[in-house]
Amino acid sequence: PIQDVIDLGIPGLVTRAINLAETDNASLIIFDIDTFGGRVDAATQIKDAISSTEIETIAFINRRAISAGSLISLSCDQIYMTGGATIGATSVVDMSGSKQSEKSQSYMREEMAATAEKSGKNPDIARGMVDEELSFEYLIVEGDTLQVDDIEGRKEGKLITLTTELAMKYGIADGKSESIEEVLSSLQIEDYEIITVGENWSENVVRILTNPTVSSLCLLYTSDAADERCRG
């Protein structure tokens, strides 16, 4: 599962899961995703790991794939979403929630577009998840050109965030399923064994230490300790 904050412990988990799947000659890898996002560097490491495997990959968005979660989902070959799920809103922000520089936005905008394009998704919609200033008159969805009055449900000047139904309409999601078993049924896979890969102790330690709150406390403790030494 790829859940909660995307931190530097998750790339190790994803890479280990992919290596295990390749060793066991698995036919499919499903990533169970529910996240509001996290670190850009961790997300790009995860994206690179997923993109590098020859095994078919599926993102199962179990409620939400926001910010970094969108990039990870788009790196998979297919996307399935539960009813009422969301994907999008991928602008790069700092820990205070303030928008980062145009350089950072430009990088993420094209990273999202390239990732979507590689997976056969619409790169312009992916760009719009990062850049609120983009608008649309035409979209190519599954080879058909659609005339649109911007993205349905999108408020003016806002990042694109798609519900399950809209993600399917615009070709971002491949289907709707309420469980991994339903995903497999949709793919007409009947004879299967599900192997779940969870965090090991080292990945869990990295997740704890790179959690923004814990990192801030460590930094504060280090600063206070330095002050004590100076006074001593």
Predicted regions and their residues:
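Hydrophobic alpha-helical transmembrane segments
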Residues: 214-220
